[in-house]
């Protein structure tokens, strides 16, 4: 089975993130504080997914994947793209840009239009919505031959855990960069490459 191995890899990654992001200092401006709040929420969702998976509560773990992705993308956009007026609107709970627009503006800003995030949105978004909003993707995995319970294929669980690991690691990298932890960049890049190369 793939999922126990992937779960252990995720748990070890979460420990690494916690050890390397604890106690970081950040500028206290609105842009930074809003962005790091999003990244911290993303990392918390990553840990929640691991915890839920350890108890075989896969439906709830899968439902959090979209929320994790949204937390990450909002943080990226707030930090790199939002105008002062948009930051103020966000603080009032009135951000009127959809997920794809946030991705497009962020990828354009960093010079990678139609990049990794766009590809993720194209390939995974419909199923993530289905899991989060109790659509067919979620409901169709609630039946087994003998009883009503979650029935998630092992390879799907492993893939979900891998996605959670990668998204949380991106959030952690943003925290390191925003706190000017240049001495950790090489270690971070090695860890990210190692994680990506051993993904199941």
Q: Can you name each region flagged by the protein language model?
A:
Residues 140-152:
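Acidic interhelical loop/turn segments
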Residues 1-38:
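N-terminal, Lys/Arg-enriched amphipathic/low-complexity engagement segments
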Residues 6-14, 20, 149-200:
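Amphipathic, Lys/Arg-enriched alpha-helical patches that create a basic surface
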Residues 80, 84, 140-143, 176, ...:
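Structured alpha-helical bundle/scaffold domains in large eukaryotic membrane-trafficking regulators
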Residues 123, 132-143:
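Substrate-binding/catalytic groove segments of enzymes
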Residues 6-9, 38-41, 64, 117-120, ...:
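Amphipathic alpha-helix face/heptad-repeat signature
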Residues 19-34, 50, 54-58, 63-127, ...:
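Short non-catalytic regulatory patches outside canonical folded cores
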Residues 13-17, 38-48, 64, 71, ...:
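Amphipathic, well-ordered alpha-helical segments in soluble domains
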């Amino acid at each position: 089975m793939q999922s126990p191995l992937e779960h252990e890899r995720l748990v070890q990654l979460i420990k690494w993130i916690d050890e390397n992001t604890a106690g970081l200092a950040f500028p206290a401006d609105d842009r930074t504080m809003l962005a790091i709040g999003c990244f911290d929420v993303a990392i918390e969702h990553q840990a929640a997914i691991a915890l839920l998976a350890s108890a075989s509560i896969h439906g709830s773990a899968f439902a959090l994947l979209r929320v994790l992705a949204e937390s990450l993308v909002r943080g990226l956009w707030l930090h790199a793209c939002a105008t002062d007026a948009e930051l103020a609107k966000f603080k009032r709970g009135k951000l009127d840009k959809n997920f794809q627009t946030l991705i497009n503006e962020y990828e354009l800003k960093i010079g990678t239009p139609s990049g990794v995030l766009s590809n993720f949105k194209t390939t995974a978004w419909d199923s993530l919505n289905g899991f989060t909003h109790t659509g067919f993707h979620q409901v169709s995995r609630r039946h087994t031959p003998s009883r009503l319970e979650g029935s998630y294929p092992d390879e799907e669980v492993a893939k979900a855990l891998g996605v959670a690991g990668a998204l949380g690691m991106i959030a952690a990298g943003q925290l390191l960069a925003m706190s000017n932890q240049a001495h950790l960049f090489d270690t971070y890049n090695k860890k990210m490459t190692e994680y990506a190369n051993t993904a199941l």
